[in-house]
Protein backbone atom coordinates (compact mmCIF):
# COMPACT_ATOMS: atom_id res chain seq x y z
CA UNK A 1 0.00 0.00 0.00
CA UNK A 2 2.83 2.35 0.89
CA UNK A 3 4.72 1.43 -2.27
CA UNK A 4 1.69 2.16 -4.47
CA UNK A 5 1.23 5.55 -2.80
CA UNK A 6 4.88 6.46 -3.37
CA UNK A 7 4.64 5.36 -7.01
CA UNK A 8 1.58 7.55 -7.58
CA UNK A 9 3.36 10.51 -6.00
CA UNK A 10 6.37 9.95 -8.25
CA UNK A 11 4.24 9.85 -11.39
CA UNK A 12 2.41 13.02 -10.35
CA UNK A 13 5.70 14.81 -9.73
CA UNK A 14 7.08 13.74 -13.13
CA UNK A 15 3.93 14.93 -14.91
CA UNK A 16 4.00 18.29 -13.17
CA UNK A 17 7.67 18.74 -14.02
CA UNK A 18 7.09 17.98 -17.71
CA UNK A 19 4.10 20.32 -17.98
CA UNK A 20 5.93 23.18 -16.25
CA UNK A 21 8.87 23.06 -18.67
CA UNK A 22 9.12 26.31 -20.68
CA UNK A 23 8.08 26.06 -24.35
CA UNK A 24 10.59 26.30 -27.15
CA UNK A 25 10.85 29.88 -28.43
CA UNK A 26 10.66 30.57 -32.17
CA UNK A 27 10.66 33.83 -34.13
CA UNK A 28 8.26 34.40 -37.03
CA UNK A 29 8.49 37.24 -39.56
CA UNK A 30 5.45 38.95 -41.07
CA UNK A 31 7.30 40.54 -44.00
CA UNK A 32 5.09 42.74 -46.15
CA UNK A 33 5.34 44.84 -49.28
CA UNK A 34 3.06 47.83 -48.85
CA UNK A 35 0.91 49.03 -51.80
CA UNK A 36 2.78 50.97 -54.48
CA UNK A 37 -0.22 52.59 -56.16
CA UNK A 38 -3.66 53.66 -54.98
CA UNK A 39 -6.49 51.19 -55.15
CA UNK A 40 -9.16 51.61 -57.80
CA UNK A 41 -12.08 53.86 -56.89
CA UNK A 42 -15.54 52.46 -56.38
CA UNK A 43 -18.62 54.09 -57.88
CA UNK A 44 -19.31 56.28 -54.84
CA UNK A 45 -15.73 57.56 -54.78
CA UNK A 46 -15.78 58.25 -58.51
CA UNK A 47 -18.98 60.27 -58.18
CA UNK A 48 -17.56 62.20 -55.23
CA UNK A 49 -14.30 63.17 -56.95
CA UNK A 50 -16.17 64.00 -60.14
CA UNK A 51 -18.46 66.33 -58.20
CA UNK A 52 -15.50 67.98 -56.43
CA UNK A 53 -13.71 68.46 -59.75
CA UNK A 54 -16.73 70.05 -61.40
CA UNK A 55 -17.30 72.25 -58.36
CA UNK A 56 -13.69 73.41 -58.43
CA UNK A 57 -13.95 74.26 -62.12
CA UNK A 58 -17.14 76.21 -61.52
CA UNK A 59 -15.61 78.25 -58.69
CA UNK A 60 -12.29 78.90 -60.40
CA UNK A 61 -11.33 82.36 -61.66
CA UNK A 62 -12.40 83.51 -65.09
CA UNK A 63 -9.80 82.90 -67.78
CA UNK A 64 -7.78 86.19 -68.13
CA UNK A 65 -7.96 86.59 -71.91
CA UNK A 66 -6.73 90.19 -71.60
CA UNK A 67 -3.40 88.89 -70.30
CA UNK A 68 -2.74 86.59 -73.26
CA UNK A 69 -4.36 88.55 -76.08
CA UNK A 70 -3.80 92.27 -76.61
CA UNK A 71 -7.02 94.21 -77.08
CA UNK A 72 -7.87 95.02 -80.68
CA UNK A 73 -5.47 92.51 -82.24
CA UNK A 74 -6.27 89.80 -84.75
CA UNK A 75 -5.32 87.17 -82.18
CA UNK A 76 -7.91 88.49 -79.74
CA UNK A 77 -10.59 88.60 -82.41
CA UNK A 78 -9.80 85.03 -83.46
CA UNK A 79 -9.89 83.81 -79.87
CA UNK A 80 -13.20 85.51 -79.06
CA UNK A 81 -14.81 84.16 -82.22
CA UNK A 82 -14.16 80.61 -81.04
CA UNK A 83 -15.74 81.07 -77.63
CA UNK A 84 -19.37 80.22 -77.04
CA UNK A 85 -20.76 83.20 -75.20
CA UNK A 86 -23.30 82.86 -72.40
CA UNK A 87 -26.98 83.61 -72.78
CA UNK A 88 -27.64 87.01 -71.32
CA UNK A 89 -30.62 88.01 -69.22
CA UNK A 90 -33.66 89.16 -71.20
CA UNK A 91 -36.98 90.51 -70.05
CA UNK A 92 -40.04 88.39 -70.64
CA UNK A 93 -38.07 85.13 -70.98
CA UNK A 94 -38.31 82.33 -68.44
CA UNK A 95 -35.05 80.56 -67.61
CA UNK A 96 -35.73 77.06 -66.16
CA UNK A 97 -32.25 76.87 -64.59
CA UNK A 98 -32.37 80.33 -63.08
CA UNK A 99 -31.59 83.84 -64.26
CA UNK A 100 -28.10 84.01 -65.82
CA UNK A 101 -25.42 85.52 -63.58
CA UNK A 102 -22.85 86.90 -66.02
CA UNK A 103 -19.59 88.50 -64.96
CA UNK A 104 -16.76 89.30 -67.38
CA UNK A 105 -18.51 87.46 -70.18
CA UNK A 106 -18.94 84.22 -68.22
CA UNK A 107 -21.89 82.44 -66.65
CA UNK A 108 -20.75 82.03 -63.03
CA UNK A 109 -23.09 79.14 -62.20
CA UNK A 110 -21.28 76.80 -64.62
CA UNK A 111 -17.68 76.02 -65.45
CA UNK A 112 -15.92 78.00 -68.16
CA UNK A 113 -14.85 76.15 -71.28
CA UNK A 114 -12.04 77.80 -73.25
CA UNK A 115 -11.51 76.76 -76.86
CA UNK A 116 -8.24 77.23 -78.72
CA UNK A 117 -7.70 77.57 -82.43
CA UNK A 118 -6.95 74.55 -84.58
CA UNK A 119 -3.50 75.95 -85.36
CA UNK A 120 -2.54 75.89 -81.69
CA UNK A 121 -3.85 72.35 -81.28
CA UNK A 122 -1.92 71.09 -84.30
CA UNK A 123 1.26 72.81 -83.16
CA UNK A 124 0.89 71.29 -79.69
CA UNK A 125 0.39 67.81 -81.17
CA UNK A 126 3.49 68.19 -83.34
CA UNK A 127 5.53 69.29 -80.35
CA UNK A 128 4.40 66.21 -78.45
CA UNK A 129 5.78 63.93 -81.17
CA UNK A 130 9.09 65.77 -81.29
CA UNK A 131 9.61 65.87 -77.52
CA UNK A 132 12.24 63.52 -76.14
CA UNK A 133 12.07 61.52 -72.92
CA UNK A 134 14.37 64.04 -71.23
CA UNK A 135 12.05 66.98 -71.91
CA UNK A 136 10.30 68.12 -68.73
CA UNK A 137 7.39 69.46 -70.79
CA UNK A 138 6.54 66.11 -72.32
CA UNK A 139 3.05 64.72 -71.55
CA UNK A 140 2.75 62.41 -68.58
CA UNK A 141 1.56 58.96 -69.67
CA UNK A 142 0.84 56.68 -66.69
CA UNK A 143 1.93 53.06 -66.71
CA UNK A 144 -0.58 50.25 -66.84
CA UNK A 145 -1.95 49.12 -63.48
CA UNK A 146 -1.76 45.51 -64.66
CA UNK A 147 1.90 44.45 -64.78
CA UNK A 148 3.57 41.62 -66.65
CA UNK A 149 3.78 39.69 -63.37
CA UNK A 150 -0.01 39.90 -63.07
CA UNK A 151 -0.50 38.62 -66.60
CA UNK A 152 1.89 35.70 -66.12
CA UNK A 153 0.62 35.02 -62.56
CA UNK A 154 4.16 35.16 -61.16
CA UNK A 155 3.65 34.64 -57.42
CA UNK A 156 7.35 35.23 -56.67
CA UNK A 157 7.45 38.73 -58.14
CA UNK A 158 7.13 41.91 -56.10
CA UNK A 159 5.70 43.66 -59.18
CA UNK A 160 2.31 41.97 -58.91
CA UNK A 161 -0.84 43.34 -57.25
CA UNK A 162 0.59 46.86 -57.00
CA UNK A 163 -2.48 48.22 -55.20
CA UNK A 164 -2.53 45.46 -52.55
CA UNK A 165 -0.38 44.52 -49.57
CA UNK A 166 1.72 41.41 -50.23
CA UNK A 167 3.09 39.08 -47.56
CA UNK A 168 5.97 36.64 -47.82
CA UNK A 169 5.06 33.00 -47.30
CA UNK A 170 7.36 29.98 -47.48
CA UNK A 171 6.70 26.28 -47.96
CA UNK A 172 8.53 23.86 -45.69
CA UNK A 173 9.71 20.36 -46.54
CA UNK A 174 6.35 18.88 -45.54
CA UNK A 175 4.54 21.05 -48.10
CA UNK A 176 2.90 23.39 -45.57
CA UNK A 177 2.77 27.11 -46.33
CA UNK A 178 3.37 29.57 -43.51
CA UNK A 179 5.19 32.75 -42.59
CA UNK A 180 8.99 32.42 -42.25
CA UNK A 181 9.96 31.28 -38.75
CA UNK A 182 13.27 30.43 -37.12
CA UNK A 183 14.51 28.83 -33.92
CA UNK A 184 15.86 31.24 -31.31
CA UNK A 185 19.53 30.22 -31.37
CA UNK A 186 20.94 33.29 -29.62
CA UNK A 187 18.95 34.51 -26.62
CA UNK A 188 21.25 37.51 -26.11
CA UNK A 189 19.83 39.29 -29.20
CA UNK A 190 16.39 40.93 -29.39
CA UNK A 191 13.73 39.07 -31.33
CA UNK A 192 13.51 41.58 -34.19
CA UNK A 193 17.31 41.61 -34.66
CA UNK A 194 17.40 37.82 -34.69
CA UNK A 195 14.56 37.77 -37.24
CA UNK A 196 16.37 40.21 -39.56
CA UNK A 197 19.62 38.23 -39.38
CA UNK A 198 17.92 34.91 -40.09
CA UNK A 199 15.96 36.43 -42.97
CA UNK A 200 19.17 37.69 -44.60
CA UNK A 201 20.78 34.29 -44.14
CA UNK A 202 17.76 32.73 -45.83
CA UNK A 203 17.69 35.09 -48.83
CA UNK A 204 21.20 36.55 -48.99
CA UNK A 205 22.27 40.19 -48.80
CA UNK A 206 20.03 41.29 -51.68
CA UNK A 207 17.09 42.19 -49.44
CA UNK A 208 16.69 45.28 -47.26
CA UNK A 209 14.01 45.25 -44.58
CA UNK A 210 12.83 47.46 -41.74
CA UNK A 211 11.28 46.16 -38.53
CA UNK A 212 8.25 48.17 -37.53
CA UNK A 213 8.78 47.56 -33.81
CA UNK A 214 10.95 45.60 -31.44
CA UNK A 215 7.77 44.31 -29.80
CA UNK A 216 6.13 41.25 -31.40
CA UNK A 217 2.65 41.79 -32.80
CA UNK A 218 1.40 38.32 -31.93
CA UNK A 219 2.30 34.87 -30.68
CA UNK A 220 1.34 31.43 -32.00
CA UNK A 221 1.28 28.75 -29.32
CA UNK A 222 1.53 25.09 -30.26
CA UNK A 223 0.56 23.01 -27.24
CA UNK A 224 1.33 19.72 -28.96
CA UNK A 225 4.90 20.59 -29.94
CA UNK A 226 5.45 22.84 -26.91
CA UNK A 227 6.51 25.86 -28.99
CA UNK A 228 5.73 29.57 -28.85
CA UNK A 229 6.30 31.54 -32.06
CA UNK A 230 6.59 35.31 -31.59
CA UNK A 231 5.74 37.19 -34.80
CA UNK A 232 7.71 40.32 -35.70
CA UNK A 233 6.30 42.74 -38.28
CA UNK A 234 8.65 44.00 -40.98
CA UNK A 235 8.54 45.79 -44.36
CA UNK A 236 10.71 45.19 -47.40
CA UNK A 237 12.27 48.48 -48.54
CA UNK A 238 14.47 47.43 -51.45
CA UNK A 239 15.91 44.40 -53.17
CA UNK A 240 14.15 41.08 -53.55
CA UNK A 241 13.69 37.80 -51.73
CA UNK A 242 15.06 34.57 -53.13
CA UNK A 243 15.83 31.34 -51.33
CA UNK A 244 19.56 30.59 -51.17
CA UNK A 245 19.93 26.84 -51.57
CA UNK A 246 23.33 26.66 -49.86
CA UNK A 247 22.03 28.37 -46.70
CA UNK A 248 18.55 26.88 -46.55
CA UNK A 249 17.51 23.42 -45.42
CA UNK A 250 14.04 24.15 -44.05
CA UNK A 251 12.08 25.73 -46.92
CA UNK A 252 11.72 24.76 -50.56
CA UNK A 253 9.51 27.48 -52.08
CA UNK A 254 8.15 30.98 -51.43
CA UNK A 255 5.45 33.35 -52.71
CA UNK A 256 4.22 36.92 -52.27
CA UNK A 257 0.49 36.71 -51.55
CA UNK A 258 -2.42 38.96 -50.64
CA UNK A 259 -4.67 38.29 -47.67
CA UNK A 260 -7.25 36.56 -49.82
CA UNK A 261 -4.63 34.35 -51.47
CA UNK A 262 -3.09 33.43 -48.11
CA UNK A 263 -6.39 31.88 -47.00
CA UNK A 264 -6.16 29.50 -49.97
CA UNK A 265 -2.56 28.44 -49.26
CA UNK A 266 -2.23 28.01 -45.49
CA UNK A 267 -4.22 25.61 -43.26
CA UNK A 268 -7.55 26.96 -42.04
CA UNK A 269 -6.65 26.97 -38.33
CA UNK A 270 -3.37 28.77 -39.09
CA UNK A 271 -5.20 31.45 -41.05
CA UNK A 272 -7.77 31.92 -38.29
CA UNK A 273 -4.96 32.64 -35.83
CA UNK A 274 -3.15 35.13 -38.08
CA UNK A 275 -5.99 36.75 -40.04
CA UNK A 276 -6.23 39.76 -37.72
CA UNK A 277 -2.57 40.61 -38.42
CA UNK A 278 -3.15 41.05 -42.18
CA UNK A 279 -4.29 44.17 -44.02
CA UNK A 280 -7.46 44.03 -46.11
CA UNK A 281 -6.15 46.32 -48.87
Swiss-Prot record:
Transit peptide: 1-19
Record GO terms (molecular function): structural constituent of ribosome
Region (Disordered): 106-141
Principal subcellular localisation of the protein: mitochondrion
Family note: Belongs to the mitochondrion-specific ribosomal protein mL46 family.
Protein role: Component of the mitochondrial ribosome (mitoribosome), a dedicated translation machinery responsible for the synthesis of mitochondrial genome-encoded proteins, including at least some of the essential transmembrane subunits of the mitochondrial respiratory chain. The mitoribosomes are attached to the mitochondrial inner membrane and translation products are cotranslationally integrated into the membrane.
Protein name: Large ribosomal subunit protein mL46
Amino acid sequence: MKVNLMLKRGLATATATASSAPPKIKVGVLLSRIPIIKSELNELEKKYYEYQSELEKRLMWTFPAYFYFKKGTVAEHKFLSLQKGPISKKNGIWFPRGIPDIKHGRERSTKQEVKLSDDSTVAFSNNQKEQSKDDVNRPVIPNDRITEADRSNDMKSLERQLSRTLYLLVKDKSGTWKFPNFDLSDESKPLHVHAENELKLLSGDQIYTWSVSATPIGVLQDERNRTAEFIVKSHILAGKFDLVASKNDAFEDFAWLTKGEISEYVPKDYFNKTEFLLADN
